[in-house]
């Protein structure tokens, strides 16, 4: 998977095309990610101990990983991801600027 939790990404297709956000969760086995503020759905919840009110909540739903691209830390544009070995470790790099994406 070319993106991971904490990456700043842009949605490149679908109803939320053009929106930017941070990845909150990644599900590699399903090839899906949850992006902050993207693909919002209404969830109906029963009253519980934690939420005695219950009601309708807005929350993010997973979207396919092919619909997001990481943002280049240098330019802020979308970029493809490359891989490079530095000091014996494999790191992700932005193809546009060559900057390392891994923190």
Curated annotation (Swiss-Prot):
A molecular function GO annotation: rRNA binding
HAMAP family associated with the record: Ribosomal_uL24_B
Subunit structure: Part of the 50S ribosomal subunit.
Protein name per its UniProtKB record: Large ribosomal subunit protein uL24
This protein's GO CC annotations: ribonucleoprotein complex; ribosome
Any one GO biological process: translation
Function summary: One of two assembly initiator proteins, it binds directly to the 5'-end of the 23S rRNA, where it nucleates assembly of the 50S subunit. One of the proteins that surrounds the polypeptide exit tunnel on the outside of the subunit.
PROSITE patterns according to UniProt: RIBOSOMAL_L24
PANTHER family, A to Z: MITOCHONDRIAL RIBOSOMAL PROTEIN L24 (PTHR12903)
InterPro entries, A to Z: KOW, Rib_uL2_dom2, Ribosomal_uL24, Ribosomal_uL24_CS, Ribosomal_uL24_KOW, Translation_prot_SH3-like_sf
S-S pairs: none
Family assignment from sequence similarity: Belongs to the universal ribosomal protein uL24 family.
Pfam families listed in its UniProt record: KOW, ribosomal_L24
Source organism of the structure: Bacillus licheniformis (strain ATCC 14580 / DSM 13 / JCM 2505 / CCUG 7422 / NBRC 12200 / NCIMB 9375 / NCTC 10341 / NRRL NRS-1264 / Gibson 46)
Entry keywords, A to Z: Ribonucleoprotein, Ribosomal protein, RNA-binding, rRNA-binding
Alphabetical list of Gene3D superfamilies matching this protein: 2.30.30.30
